Amino acid sequence: MADVLRRAINQKKQFLKTKLLLSEFYQGRGEQLADYTLSELEKEYKSLQKMKKEI
């Protein structure tokens, strides 16, 4: 069970990192994003989505 949860968390982290890196704002910050927790990545992604809506 722990393996399934760990795998799901890693997949979600990879998905969020990819989305953030594809945005113009986060280009070149891959090493920094690699150290982020899932919660931090989700927060950054939500901030990015909010910024996109404001533009």
From Swiss-Prot:
Domain of life: Bacteria
Pfam families: Fur_reg_FbpA (PF13076)
Name by which UniProt lists this protein: Uncharacterized protein YebD
Taxonomy of the source species: Bacteria, Bacillati, Bacillota, Bacilli, Bacillales
